């Protein structure tokens, strides 16, 4: 049985998409020496902040996202599949963003998209609450793909609890 070689990229996301795109590109290049079959990136690979207005102003639509364009090109040039853990993206005619994961084939094609289903809405105490549902639209579909005869399911952060 063939082994599946996976490189997991970890980095502390910044609040600007340009900074994160540069961090991802640097980390993609670092994986080359391992010759992975699959590269995985973290949740919120493009931007992270709790400021909803900043998010709405500084996120892009999927078709305009520089990280997707870069990942597709890298996948082709290096014959590697890429799972973008998630990107925070705008959607046409919607006031909320989506938290979307992508699977890009080694041919540079998006073969799967998954929108986070379970929003993290919680009251920690009187002073601390989190309401992802105020900013993000929940996904509806469970998604999986096959890579080298291995079934891979998608989940983003809080989805793991369900």
Could you tell me what each predicted segment is?
Residues 92-162:
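Active-site catalytic loop in hydrolytic enzyme cores
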Residues 8-9, 51-53, 64-73, 112-115, ...:
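A generic short-segment signal for beta-strand/edge and adjacent turn/coil regions
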Residues 17, 26-107:
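Cys-nucleophile CN-hydrolase/nitrilase-fold catalytic domain and related Cys-dependent amidase chemistry
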Residues 2-7:
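Extreme N-terminal starter segment of soluble prokaryotic enzymes
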Residues 10-15:
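Short polar catalytic/cofactor-binding loops
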Residues 1, 41-45, 135-139:
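Short hydrophobic/aromatic-rich motifs at helix boundaries and adjacent loops
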